[in-house]
Amino acid sequence: SRMKRGAALADLMGYTAEVQAQARKCADAINASGAKTVVVLDSYDAEIMAQKYGEWGCELSSGLVTATAFVAKLIEDGLLTVRNANGILAACHDDDRLARTFHEFEPIRAIAKAAGYELTEMFNHGKLAKSCGSAVALVYMPEITKKVAAGRWDDLLRTEAAAMLTANPESYICLAESVPEGKVLVDLYSALDKE
């Protein structure tokens, strides 16, 4: 089963004792593994691990890196090759937690460029990034979450981009709910499966 890290429960009910207990259990398992670096795929998890684990006395003994930064570095070092998108014009959805917590904008663009995408920017990108909702919110308030995600698509429609690129599982789940006709949603990690 998937290790509970506390992020989903925190989004649902706040930073309660139950959330902190999940975080402590996760940190203990990571620390016991002896891992030198933890690569975190979901920015929601990365945010809570980076910001809250220390406050709650369950620090990680390892380094923490987002999956986008990790993959971009592998590509830069020539350790990972990607399939070519043949110049499709796309815009990157800057995950709001990566943007606001980690000020991380370049890794997703480096991955996209390596994968052969031509890039344009939506108005709300970088530090102006907007949320597209969360997987937890999609369960308990689906209509609102779909409207929030549709707002990101509206931003894309003001560009000439054919595709929206995301590198976050929660973003992909939410954005997939309202893909406009003629546009494509791309999980950027899917570009990593072939040369």
Please give the residue ranges for each predicted region.
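Iron-sulfur cluster-binding electron-transfer modules in prokaryotic oxidoreductases
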Residues: 1-195
